[in-house]
Protein backbone atom coordinates (compact mmCIF):
# COMPACT_ATOMS: atom_id res chain seq x y z
CA UNK A 1 0.00 0.00 0.00
CA UNK A 2 1.02 3.61 -0.56
CA UNK A 3 2.25 5.72 2.35
CA UNK A 4 -0.40 8.35 2.95
CA UNK A 5 0.71 11.97 3.01
CA UNK A 6 -1.47 13.08 5.91
CA UNK A 7 -0.89 16.47 7.52
CA UNK A 8 -2.15 15.53 10.94
CA UNK A 9 -2.62 18.02 13.79
CA UNK A 10 -0.40 18.02 16.84
CA UNK A 11 -0.48 15.00 19.11
CA UNK A 12 -3.79 14.96 21.01
CA UNK A 13 -3.78 16.25 24.55
CA UNK A 14 -5.32 14.33 27.42
CA UNK A 15 -8.39 16.56 27.40
CA UNK A 16 -10.68 16.35 24.37
CA UNK A 17 -10.11 19.11 21.84
CA UNK A 18 -13.01 20.31 19.71
CA UNK A 19 -11.86 20.91 16.13
CA UNK A 20 -14.43 22.45 13.81
CA UNK A 21 -14.07 23.95 10.35
CA UNK A 22 -15.61 26.15 7.69
CA UNK A 23 -14.95 25.03 4.13
CA UNK A 24 -16.08 27.51 1.46
CA UNK A 25 -15.49 27.06 -2.24
CA UNK A 26 -13.92 30.02 -4.10
CA UNK A 27 -16.62 30.09 -6.76
CA UNK A 28 -17.74 33.50 -5.55
CA UNK A 29 -17.89 35.89 -2.61
CA UNK A 30 -19.50 35.06 0.73
CA UNK A 31 -23.22 35.89 1.01
CA UNK A 32 -25.65 35.92 3.95
CA UNK A 33 -26.19 32.15 3.75
CA UNK A 34 -22.42 31.65 3.89
CA UNK A 35 -22.21 33.94 6.92
CA UNK A 36 -24.84 31.92 8.76
CA UNK A 37 -22.89 28.69 8.21
CA UNK A 38 -19.55 30.27 9.09
CA UNK A 39 -20.93 31.92 12.22
CA UNK A 40 -22.68 28.77 13.46
CA UNK A 41 -19.57 26.64 13.02
CA UNK A 42 -17.38 29.32 14.64
CA UNK A 43 -19.64 29.81 17.66
CA UNK A 44 -20.11 26.08 18.23
CA UNK A 45 -16.32 25.69 18.34
CA UNK A 46 -15.53 28.74 20.43
CA UNK A 47 -18.33 28.16 22.97
CA UNK A 48 -16.82 24.76 23.77
CA UNK A 49 -14.32 24.68 26.63
CA UNK A 50 -12.61 21.43 27.66
CA UNK A 51 -11.37 20.30 31.07
CA UNK A 52 -8.14 22.22 30.54
CA UNK A 53 -10.02 25.46 29.90
CA UNK A 54 -9.20 25.39 26.18
CA UNK A 55 -11.67 26.72 23.62
CA UNK A 56 -12.43 24.69 20.56
CA UNK A 57 -10.38 25.23 17.41
CA UNK A 58 -11.98 26.64 14.26
CA UNK A 59 -10.17 25.85 11.04
CA UNK A 60 -10.54 27.15 7.50
CA UNK A 61 -10.37 24.97 4.40
CA UNK A 62 -10.65 26.43 0.91
CA UNK A 63 -12.31 23.84 -1.33
CA UNK A 64 -10.54 24.82 -4.55
CA UNK A 65 -10.25 21.47 -6.33
CA UNK A 66 -12.88 22.32 -8.95
CA UNK A 67 -10.71 24.81 -10.83
CA UNK A 68 -13.17 25.46 -13.71
CA UNK A 69 -15.67 26.90 -11.18
CA UNK A 70 -13.13 28.97 -9.26
CA UNK A 71 -13.49 32.76 -9.43
CA UNK A 72 -10.22 34.64 -9.60
CA UNK A 73 -9.41 36.35 -6.31
CA UNK A 74 -12.30 34.71 -4.44
CA UNK A 75 -10.11 32.76 -2.00
CA UNK A 76 -8.40 35.90 -0.75
CA UNK A 77 -11.68 37.81 -0.66
CA UNK A 78 -13.31 35.07 1.44
CA UNK A 79 -10.55 35.23 4.04
CA UNK A 80 -10.74 39.03 4.11
CA UNK A 81 -14.49 38.87 4.71
CA UNK A 82 -14.17 36.37 7.55
CA UNK A 83 -11.68 38.65 9.28
CA UNK A 84 -13.91 41.69 8.76
CA UNK A 85 -16.74 39.82 10.50
CA UNK A 86 -14.56 38.85 13.46
CA UNK A 87 -14.34 35.18 12.49
CA UNK A 88 -10.65 34.56 13.09
CA UNK A 89 -9.45 31.04 12.36
CA UNK A 90 -6.87 28.88 14.12
CA UNK A 91 -3.84 27.32 12.43
CA UNK A 92 -3.07 27.77 8.74
CA UNK A 93 -5.83 27.75 6.15
CA UNK A 94 -5.79 24.51 4.15
CA UNK A 95 -6.21 24.63 0.36
CA UNK A 96 -7.53 21.43 -1.19
CA UNK A 97 -5.46 22.12 -4.30
CA UNK A 98 -2.37 21.23 -2.22
CA UNK A 99 -3.77 17.83 -1.24
CA UNK A 100 -3.70 16.01 -4.59
CA UNK A 101 -1.01 13.47 -3.69
CA UNK A 102 -2.83 12.62 -0.46
CA UNK A 103 -6.08 12.02 -2.38
CA UNK A 104 -4.26 9.89 -4.97
CA UNK A 105 -2.74 7.76 -2.20
CA UNK A 106 -6.17 7.10 -0.72
CA UNK A 107 -7.54 6.17 -4.15
CA UNK A 108 -4.59 3.83 -4.70
CA UNK A 109 -5.12 2.09 -1.37
CA UNK A 110 -8.83 1.68 -2.01
CA UNK A 111 -8.09 0.12 -5.40
CA UNK A 112 -5.49 -2.25 -3.93
CA UNK A 113 -8.00 -3.48 -1.38
CA UNK A 114 -10.67 -3.87 -4.08
CA UNK A 115 -12.82 -1.24 -2.43
CA UNK A 116 -13.27 0.77 -5.63
CA UNK A 117 -13.76 0.20 -9.35
CA UNK A 118 -14.00 2.11 -12.63
CA UNK A 119 -17.38 2.98 -14.08
CA UNK A 120 -18.37 4.30 -17.51
CA UNK A 121 -22.07 4.88 -16.84
CA UNK A 122 -23.30 8.38 -17.68
CA UNK A 123 -25.73 10.52 -15.70
CA UNK A 124 -28.34 10.16 -18.43
CA UNK A 125 -28.05 6.36 -18.33
CA UNK A 126 -28.50 6.31 -14.57
CA UNK A 127 -31.41 8.74 -14.79
CA UNK A 128 -33.07 6.47 -17.36
CA UNK A 129 -33.18 3.59 -14.84
CA UNK A 130 -34.65 5.66 -12.02
CA UNK A 131 -31.76 7.83 -10.90
CA UNK A 132 -30.14 5.32 -8.54
CA UNK A 133 -26.92 3.66 -9.67
CA UNK A 134 -27.30 -0.13 -9.53
CA UNK A 135 -23.65 -1.23 -9.52
CA UNK A 136 -23.66 -2.08 -13.23
CA UNK A 137 -19.88 -1.71 -13.65
CA UNK A 138 -18.77 -3.29 -10.37
CA UNK A 139 -17.58 -6.53 -11.98
CA UNK A 140 -16.75 -5.17 -15.44
CA UNK A 141 -13.02 -4.57 -14.79
CA UNK A 142 -12.85 -1.40 -16.85
CA UNK A 143 -9.62 0.58 -17.10
CA UNK A 144 -9.19 4.03 -15.59
CA UNK A 145 -8.92 5.96 -18.85
CA UNK A 146 -12.02 8.10 -19.37
CA UNK A 147 -13.94 6.49 -16.52
CA UNK A 148 -15.07 7.54 -13.07
CA UNK A 149 -14.04 5.69 -9.90
CA UNK A 150 -16.75 4.45 -7.54
CA UNK A 151 -16.50 3.24 -3.95
CA UNK A 152 -17.63 -0.30 -3.17
CA UNK A 153 -20.33 0.67 -0.68
CA UNK A 154 -20.35 -2.02 1.99
CA UNK A 155 -22.27 -0.13 4.66
CA UNK A 156 -24.92 2.15 3.19
CA UNK A 157 -25.21 4.23 6.34
CA UNK A 158 -28.35 6.33 6.02
CA UNK A 159 -29.18 7.72 9.46
CA UNK A 160 -27.38 9.63 12.16
CA UNK A 161 -27.95 11.83 15.20
CA UNK A 162 -27.56 15.49 14.29
CA UNK A 163 -26.38 18.18 16.72
CA UNK A 164 -29.30 20.43 15.74
CA UNK A 165 -31.86 18.38 13.79
CA UNK A 166 -31.90 15.35 16.15
CA UNK A 167 -32.32 11.97 14.40
CA UNK A 168 -31.92 12.27 10.63
CA UNK A 169 -32.92 9.56 8.16
CA UNK A 170 -31.61 9.95 4.61
CA UNK A 171 -32.71 8.31 1.36
CA UNK A 172 -31.75 4.68 1.93
CA UNK A 173 -31.46 3.76 -1.75
CA UNK A 174 -29.22 6.74 -2.44
CA UNK A 175 -27.11 5.99 0.64
CA UNK A 176 -26.53 2.44 -0.64
CA UNK A 177 -25.18 3.56 -4.02
CA UNK A 178 -21.58 2.91 -5.02
CA UNK A 179 -20.90 6.65 -5.23
CA UNK A 180 -18.21 8.41 -7.26
CA UNK A 181 -14.94 9.30 -5.51
CA UNK A 182 -12.94 10.33 -8.61
CA UNK A 183 -14.62 11.95 -11.59
CA UNK A 184 -14.08 10.90 -15.18
CA UNK A 185 -12.76 14.39 -15.99
CA UNK A 186 -9.88 13.73 -13.60
CA UNK A 187 -11.13 15.88 -10.71
CA UNK A 188 -11.35 14.45 -7.21
CA UNK A 189 -14.95 14.03 -6.09
CA UNK A 190 -16.28 16.16 -3.25
CA UNK A 191 -17.02 13.13 -1.05
CA UNK A 192 -13.43 11.89 -1.19
CA UNK A 193 -11.78 15.27 -0.68
CA UNK A 194 -13.96 16.38 2.21
CA UNK A 195 -13.57 13.15 4.18
CA UNK A 196 -9.84 12.94 3.49
CA UNK A 197 -9.32 16.50 4.69
CA UNK A 198 -11.51 16.08 7.77
CA UNK A 199 -9.21 13.19 8.70
CA UNK A 200 -6.04 15.14 7.92
CA UNK A 201 -7.17 18.13 9.97
CA UNK A 202 -8.44 16.03 12.87
CA UNK A 203 -11.95 17.49 12.59
CA UNK A 204 -14.27 16.41 15.42
CA UNK A 205 -17.37 18.48 14.58
CA UNK A 206 -18.85 19.56 11.24
CA UNK A 207 -21.46 22.34 11.34
CA UNK A 208 -22.97 23.29 7.97
CA UNK A 209 -26.22 23.77 6.04
CA UNK A 210 -29.09 21.30 5.67
CA UNK A 211 -28.41 21.05 1.92
CA UNK A 212 -25.61 18.65 2.90
CA UNK A 213 -27.76 16.19 4.87
CA UNK A 214 -27.79 13.57 2.09
CA UNK A 215 -24.02 13.83 1.40
CA UNK A 216 -23.44 13.25 5.12
CA UNK A 217 -24.69 9.68 4.74
CA UNK A 218 -22.10 9.02 2.02
CA UNK A 219 -19.37 10.64 4.07
CA UNK A 220 -20.23 8.46 7.07
CA UNK A 221 -19.93 5.41 4.82
CA UNK A 222 -16.55 6.54 3.48
CA UNK A 223 -15.28 7.22 7.01
CA UNK A 224 -16.27 3.71 8.04
CA UNK A 225 -14.72 2.17 4.91
CA UNK A 226 -11.39 3.90 5.51
CA UNK A 227 -11.37 3.21 9.24
CA UNK A 228 -12.06 -0.50 8.71
CA UNK A 229 -9.39 -0.88 6.03
CA UNK A 230 -6.16 1.15 6.00
CA UNK A 231 -6.71 4.60 7.53
CA UNK A 232 -7.73 4.67 11.19
CA UNK A 233 -9.83 7.73 11.89
CA UNK A 234 -12.57 9.13 14.08
CA UNK A 235 -15.86 10.11 12.46
CA UNK A 236 -16.89 13.70 13.30
CA UNK A 237 -20.18 14.70 14.87
CA UNK A 238 -22.42 16.48 12.36
CA UNK A 239 -24.75 19.40 12.85
CA UNK A 240 -26.91 20.93 10.12
CA UNK A 241 -28.46 24.38 10.31
CA UNK A 242 -31.46 25.60 8.28
CA UNK A 243 -30.93 27.07 4.84
CA UNK A 244 -31.75 30.71 4.18
CA UNK A 245 -34.21 30.92 1.28
CA UNK A 246 -35.99 33.71 -0.60
CA UNK A 247 -39.76 34.16 -0.87
CA UNK A 248 -39.53 32.41 -4.26
CA UNK A 249 -38.06 29.36 -2.53
CA UNK A 250 -34.51 29.79 -3.79
CA UNK A 251 -31.58 29.00 -1.51
CA UNK A 252 -29.13 31.85 -1.03
CA UNK A 253 -26.15 30.62 -3.00
CA UNK A 254 -23.43 31.77 -5.35
CA UNK A 255 -25.16 29.91 -8.18
CA UNK A 256 -28.34 31.90 -7.52
CA UNK A 257 -26.39 35.18 -7.55
CA UNK A 258 -26.91 35.94 -3.87
CA UNK A 259 -25.41 39.36 -3.08
CA UNK A 260 -22.12 39.50 -1.21
CA UNK A 261 -22.15 40.61 2.43
CA UNK A 262 -20.73 44.04 3.20
CA UNK A 263 -17.27 44.00 4.78
CA UNK A 264 -17.50 47.71 5.56
CA UNK A 265 -20.59 47.33 7.77
CA UNK A 266 -20.58 43.83 9.32
CA UNK A 267 -22.70 44.48 12.43
CA UNK A 268 -26.22 44.36 10.90
CA UNK A 269 -25.53 41.10 9.05
CA UNK A 270 -23.94 39.53 12.15
CA UNK A 271 -26.98 40.39 14.28
CA UNK A 272 -29.36 39.14 11.56
CA UNK A 273 -27.42 35.86 11.37
CA UNK A 274 -27.64 35.41 15.16
CA UNK A 275 -31.40 35.96 15.02
CA UNK A 276 -31.68 33.49 12.12
CA UNK A 277 -29.86 30.93 14.30
CA UNK A 278 -32.44 31.34 17.04
CA UNK A 279 -30.22 33.19 19.49
CA UNK A 280 -33.16 35.39 20.45
CA UNK A 281 -32.12 37.11 23.69
CA UNK A 282 -29.97 39.66 21.91
CA UNK A 283 -29.44 43.04 23.62
CA UNK A 284 -29.05 46.24 21.65
CA UNK A 285 -25.81 45.40 19.87
CA UNK A 286 -26.30 47.67 16.87
CA UNK A 287 -23.80 50.19 18.19
CA UNK A 288 -21.37 47.53 19.46
CA UNK A 289 -18.11 46.65 17.74
CA UNK A 290 -17.72 43.46 15.74
CA UNK A 291 -15.52 42.03 18.50
CA UNK A 292 -18.14 42.81 21.16
CA UNK A 293 -20.88 41.14 19.13
CA UNK A 294 -18.77 38.04 18.55
CA UNK A 295 -17.77 37.79 22.22
CA UNK A 296 -21.39 38.16 23.30
CA UNK A 297 -22.43 35.48 20.82
CA UNK A 298 -19.76 33.03 22.03
CA UNK A 299 -20.80 33.52 25.66
CA UNK A 300 -24.52 33.07 24.93
CA UNK A 301 -24.40 30.40 22.20
CA UNK A 302 -27.03 27.68 22.70
CA UNK A 303 -27.31 24.75 20.31
CA UNK A 304 -30.86 23.93 21.38
CA UNK A 305 -32.11 27.32 20.18
CA UNK A 306 -31.10 26.64 16.56
CA UNK A 307 -34.35 25.97 14.64
CA UNK A 308 -35.09 22.35 13.79
CA UNK A 309 -36.00 23.12 10.20
CA UNK A 310 -34.59 22.41 6.76
CA UNK A 311 -35.03 26.00 5.54
CA UNK A 312 -36.21 29.42 6.68
CA UNK A 313 -37.60 32.24 4.53
CA UNK A 314 -35.64 35.45 5.13
CA UNK A 315 -37.79 37.82 3.03
Swiss-Prot record:
Protein purpose: Catalyzes the tRNA-independent activation of glutamate in presence of ATP and the subsequent transfer of glutamate onto a tRNA(Asp). Glutamate is transferred on the 2-amino-5-(4,5-dihydroxy-2-cyclopenten-1-yl) moiety of the queuosine in the wobble position of the QUC anticodon.
Enzyme Commission number(s) from the entry: 6.1.1.-
Organism: Colwellia psychrerythraea (strain 34H / ATCC BAA-681) (Vibrio psychroerythus)
Motif, 'KMSKS' region: chain positions: 251-255
UniProt-recorded Gene Ontology molecular function terms: ATP binding; glutamate-tRNA ligase activity; zinc ion binding
Signal peptide range in chain numbering: none
UniProt cross-references to Pfam families, sorted A to Z: tRNA-synt_1c (PF00749)
Protein name (database record): Glutamyl-Q tRNA(Asp) synthetase
Amino-acid positions noted as binding L-glutamate in the UniProt annotation, renumbered to this chain: 21-25, 63, 190, 208
Keywords: Aminoacyl-tRNA synthetase, ATP-binding, Ligase, Metal-binding, Nucleotide-binding, Zinc
GO biological process terms held by the UniProt record: glutamyl-tRNA aminoacylation; tRNA modification
Domain of life: Bacteria
Cellular component terms (Gene Ontology): cytosol
Binding site for Zn(2+): 119, 121, 133, 137
Keyword Zinc set for record: yes
Gene3D superfamilies: Glutamyl-tRNA Synthetase, Domain 3, HUPs
EC top class named in words: ligase
InterPro entries tied to this protein: Glu-Q_tRNA(Asp)_Synthase, Glu/Gln-tRNA-synth, Glu/Gln-tRNA-synth_Ib_cat-dom, GluQ/Sye, Rossmann-like_a/b/a_fold
Cofactor(s) demanded: Zn(2+)
Family to which the UniProt record says this protein belongs: Belongs to the class-I aminoacyl-tRNA synthetase family. GluQ subfamily.
Gene: gluQ
